[in-house]
């Protein structure tokens, strides 16, 4: 666990340059807390309660070199803090990707880890680690899924109720094509031999995501790639309904994509593709609900260079998904960063907010509620650089806990003085440090300290109307409540009744 003192000083210095916002508008607590991942270079992570104690745990794939530490498991101990990593070896060289699901139906989360396999064929480029039933894991079982696994996902692609594994192989052993491998699950933690689908580009595919893109109830696939002209694309593989993906369709993404995720960012009920690029921008391709996508729209992230990961989550409590992007991939001290792009509400995004993560490179980011306060937090696989004594060079996990936004309430009257029995409307307007105030939050109104009623927010304001004020001078107060996403605030106005 993190120590204090010098660490805090070093982090604070880094964040003064990395974060162009006041402490009043912070979405996440600074500085982040940094843990060692148990390996040489944390590359990918997932969050799940692997020991079923009700507290989220972090699982880290620890890099692509021999002796890298395989996969590390950091048990959560409450409050968004974690124990030291327990590590488990994988079957070949290193671990570049990890996914978590119950693979054998025993109710306990298991692990699938993708590795840089090697040049022999077949190679155990996938390692399956079954949970022992206490959050620790059995020895890895190997499966061949290609040469260089960069991304893995778990989904029931053939509709038999058993989880299957999808793995993205960046390059075959001849370095000619990227491919996606599908391993159908048997329901007992074992899998059939991989069925592979060659992609349309060369050896440029880096990331995959899965979701039902056309509403048929079957998971489809989206992958980042580049075509033969070097244009950034996403490739869409629609499920035939039985777990086969024979057709590949490409869409220009406007960027060479390093990471892709799927989610409904514009609120139309259809999955959209969000692509982080190698050039510092993020592309949004709106889904049409039939497996096709609209033209990409690009947004700057404020991160110069190769972005590494993108995740989505509602960070400000307005009911719309926001974006978190990690990067850039540059080997400089305390270079790791994440960019937060708040959704405007219709799938467009505000200017980025930048947070430093304290390490050399931020390789992967996940959004999860780590301390069970109902507000999303961030976990970043962040290679350490040796500048922090409690995190020497090697793999690190940076934790940024979410904090409620400061709010400001103003209160106005429809007219003062008023006559006895006359209708008077009091309007409380609430502004948050980041993002809009959601509709439906109940604001309480008081007259000289006595509660007189409530009104729900609508478009950032709550209006309360009364005719019951007695003759005299009244101090009316509107109180906006605290919540996981917002701090409380209040305001008063004087009302004279003749």
Regions found by a protein language model. Give the residues of each.
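Blade-edge motifs of beta-propeller repeat domains
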Residues: 24-40, 75-93, 130-147, 184-202, ...
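Beta-propeller blade termini
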Residues: 43-52, 96-103, 130, 141, ...
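Glycine-aliphatic tripeptides that mark coil-to-beta-strand junctions in extracellular
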Residues: 54-56, 107-109, 161-163, 217-219, ...
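Hydrophobic beta-strand segments that make up the repeating blades of beta-propeller
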Residues: 58-62, 111-115, 165-169, 221-225, ...
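Short glycine/acidic-enriched loop and turn motifs that connect beta-strands
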Residues: 63-68, 116-121, 170-175, 226-231, ...
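A short loop-to-beta-strand structural motif that recurs across blades of beta-propeller domains
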Residues: 69-73, 124-129, 178-183, 232-237, ...
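Blade-level signature of beta-propeller repeat domains, shared across WD40, Kelch, NHL, RCC1
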Residues: 363-404
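Solvent-exposed beta-strand/loop surfaces, strongest in extracytoplasmic domains of secreted
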Residues: 403-498
